[in-house]
Regions:
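Sec/Tat signal peptide C-region and signal peptidase I cleavage site
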Residues: 19-24
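Short, structured beta-strand/loop micro-motifs enriched in basic residues and often containing a Trp
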Residues: 31-41, 72-79, 263-271
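Glycine-rich anion/phosphate-binding loop at the beta-strand->alpha-helix junction
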Residues: 101-106, 111-114, 118-119, 123-141, ...
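Bacterial N-terminal signal peptides
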Residues: 8-18
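N-terminal, Lys/Arg-enriched amphipathic/low-complexity engagement segments
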Residues: 25-71
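Bacterial N-terminal signal peptides that target proteins for export
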Residues: 1-9
């Protein structure tokens, strides 16, 4: 039987007053977001608001593996507290310009894993259960290092929900330009100082994964740092774990046997902030749907690097300082985010036409008496779903609705002038295509797209 979470009238009033206070406060040019949360939605407290054109400086903790091994958290991620944007209403959009991503951690750890079957109820990321006393999301304490160091405060049993099957620890150089895998003797020393090496912020909620002393991979593997943000965007229109705010994870909440369960109809209320797209990095712009009043900008799950697909399931989570410039776009109704990546990150077919290419195309048009569509610029639509096919379908449908054309036409545009790229397995993708600038003008995003690709 599906469980329904009811919010008492007093609690609901307090939550509404909290949001109203944020929205009624004088808008600020700069807002600092340091408080950490594991669940977001309409009941979330918001800070701010920040002005359109203002700056958000967020300091998220290492937030995938850390929350996964922190039983009291109801999510596989954490994010910084939602920031309201002045004037943002449902049906608007908010552009987030990523100005700076500064890695703060000195080391990180990651790997592949399996869930331990008797230590969760339905979802090992959400409803973590102590195998001895049966408490769901039990309070815990740290005793030493390693996989059995995190123990239930009620009964003393080890209670993390995951077993790492192949893990590694990565140590960064001074300027955070690269990392190197290290041997067991070094990971043991890092584990003893895990909070310092991971640079867990003072308001962090998670245990640092570096305390597990993971060293299955050979030492000496060099990994280039190209920091990106795995979970950034707006607050969804239903309360949910921060980790599950994308179609390939929201689906696991439908009819789930725990308190964070949602209905099938609720899936569309996600905002797809948890993209894990490696091109969401310094210099990129993400245009996000507003699904609750104020928008509620959240930042988390910063990675030191990530290959397309994140096929290990996780990557190198780090503490970071993220600087965003915010721009409100009135009346742009989106179902999911639009990404404007850095010019060099665009698919080959979506790059700006050269003068020579335009001239050659116009010669063909002149010869046969038709005009060439030369005034085109690229956009990427995020699609998500339980698997890659459904994610692509989602992205295509979202693009079709945005542009007022058929999905079949989108498929042809994408095939000729863009491409589909994998953000995360099993189901987050980017759908890229060239779009007439006149249409971008009509949508109100032409200045942003021109700023990104014609500067």
């Amino acid at each position: 039987m599906r469980r329904v979470v009811c919010i008492g009238s007093v609690a609901l009033l307090c939550l509404l007053l909290g949001l109203s206070s944020a929205m009624a406060a004088e808008a600020q040019k700069i807002v600092f977001a340091s408080e950490i949360v594991d669940v977001i939605g309409p009941s979330s407290k918001m800070i701010g608001p920040v002005q359109s054109g203002g700056i958000i400086i967020a300091t998220p903790e290492p937030a995938c593996y850390g929350p996964m091994i922190t039983p009291q958290l109801r999510s596989g991620h954490t994010q910084t507290i939602p920031v309201a944007v002045e004037g943002a209403k449902v049906g608007d959009a908010i552009a987030l310009k990523i100005k700076k991503v500064r890695v703060l951690s000195k080391a990180t750890a990651s790997g592949t894993e399996i869930a331990i079957k008797d230590r969760f109820v339905g979802d090992p990321f959400v409803a973590k259960r102590c195998p001895k006393c049966g408490t769901v999301n039990p309070p815990t304490e740290l005793k030493g290092t390693g996989a059995e160091a995190i123990r239930c405060k009620i009964c003393g049993a080890p209670c993390i929900t995951f077993q790492v099957t192949n893990g590694y620890t990565l140590l960064f150089d001074e300027d955070r330009s690269l990392g190197v895998t290290v041997p067991k003797a070094v990971t043991d020393e890092i584990a003893k100082q895990a909070y310092e090496y991971s640079a867990v912020p003072t308001k962090g909620l998670s245990y640092p994964v570096t305390l597990l002393s993971l060293a299955d991979m050979p030492p000496g593997i060099i990994a280039r740092v190209r920091a990106m943000i795995g979970n950034m965007g707006t607050t969804p229109a239903i309360d949910m774990p921060t980790s599950h705010n994308a179609g390939d994870l929201t689906c696991f909440l439908v009819g789930a046997p725990h308190k964070m369960a949602i209905t099938k109809a609720d899936e569309a209320k996600r905002s797809d902030a948890h993209m894990d797209i490696d091109n969401v990095r310094e210099g990129a712009i993400v245009i996000c749907p507003v699904k609750v009043a104020g928008g509620g900008i959240v930042v988390g799950d910063v990675h030191a690097m990530q290959g397309d697909g994140e096929i290990s399931g996780h990557t190198t989570d780090v503490s970071a300082e993220v600087t965003l410039e915010v721009e409100l776009i009135k009346g742009l109704k989106l179902e999911g985010p639009i990404l404007l990546p850095n010019k060099e990150d665009l698919p080959f077919l979506a790059k700006e036409y050269t003068a020579d290419q335009l001239q050659r195309a116009r010669s063909i048009g002149d010869k046969f008496g038709f005009a060439v569509l030369g005034d085109l610029l690229p956009i990427q639509m995020i699609g998500s779903g339980p698997n890659l096919n459904e994610a692509v379908g989602c992205g295509v449908d979202r693009m079709a609705k945005l542009l007022g054309i058929t999905p079949e036409a989108v498929k042809n545009w994408v095939t000729m002038t863009g491409g589909v790229e994998i953000g995360r397995l099993p189901g987050v993708v980017t759908v890229t295509m060239m779009v007439p600038v006149a249409k971008l003008q009509e949508l109100g995003i032409a200045p942003l797209v021109k700023e990104q690709y014609l500067k």
